[in-house]
Amino acid sequence: MPSDELVVLVHGLGANKLLMWPLARRLARAGYRTVNWSYPSFLRTIERHGANLRELLDRLDAEPEAARIHLVAHSMGCIVARQALLSGVPRKIGRFVMLAPPNQGSPLASLFGPLTRCCFPTIDQLARRPDSFVNRLLEPDGLEIGVIAARVDWLVGVANTHLPCQRDHIVVSGTHSLMVFQSGVAREVVEFLRQGRFTAANRTK
């Protein structure tokens, strides 16, 4: 695998880049350069985080060393990445793997969002109600997206991970937070980045 392919990793709500470090390490072993991006997820809004991520993507897109840039995000990080791509997909963006994404909202966000709106606005933005931020967010255009859901996930149900424009979707054993540490999940991420499909054994029936 040529080292001119770059993967940008984006963590989720209440986490930091340390959570994505094991996955970043496995991707590096598979031959990818990695950028493990961090942001203050509880503070500010998804729009602000998305704008900051977009600045990073535009800088990387301008680097001659990077021939192709992929995205791998977990949980709310997937929504931040979707927001970053709202104004258009940078020229070198390749594929996007979403891990447990609340693409249709989260039941816990629906429960606690109104109570935390003043201090932690991002939680309410992930609510399942039809008029929530995440359910009004446009889908990325012209991008190959693969979604990996966790079978045991009390934060984001499998049904809420789907995105109409997704190219592939699988459900793996594991939980919402621990799935990013699983070697099998890392293998599926690499498979999608290389082939644009997950392995047939895990593909959602």
Q: Where does each model-flagged region fall?
A:
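Serine-dependent carboxylesterase/thioesterase catalytic core
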Residues: 2, 7-18, 22, 26-40, ...
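Helical cap/lid subdomain of alpha/beta-hydrolase-fold lipid enzymes
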Residues: 86-205
